[in-house]
């Protein structure tokens, strides 16, 4: 057997190992609507917190946000200048700003303050950018990073003034610490395979939910390419999912193309919900999923 060490391939293989049963009797037309952080959206498929999309297409960050706004989904954004974030928000996209774990916490507080003043509905941090692959602290575009303590995360939570979310959680261990810090949500993610042999987010999701319950939103990131992928995450307990790299090639075609693909993913999700007897997101049931063992 030729086993890959690539987390992206491992994640894809895990998605493809999950099979669904159907439930037609007494089923009805489903609704994919969801409320997150006090705002209503058309579906639980969100855009992922990407950065530097101008390298993919001119004005890529704004195009990405405009696509999210047109599709009526929650938008996430990563690194970028204050001016870029303001342009993203000018599209009307309801946006979550994710901030790197800068070594100097004053940088973190400053970026949070600007994001909230500019109109972001939530902020957060991708904690997995703390270390490099050689065991030292990471550096992102020359900016020094550092691992954060639970107390530091609590300080960010208390200072934010809006919901604070931790991205890069891949264990019950970190999830429980996020709860202790008062986080308003977590993103289960291996950050596009930052570490070889990382467990697929969807694989560890049930263990995380067993540890922390459903008191806060638990989002799933990495490898989401279809409404079927989204359904599998939701059935196993995710609140919503993020699609990122799957949408990147569409940036050259414009916001309408991005919105159209997100809309298609929502329709794919609704199609699977209908065929498995799920009328609303609150009725998701993990017992519909079977693991391939052949």
Each model region followed by its residue ranges:
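Alpha/beta enzyme core
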Residues: 66, 91, 103-220, 227-251, ...
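Active-site cofactor/substrate anionic-group-binding motifs, chiefly glycine-
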Residues: 36-80
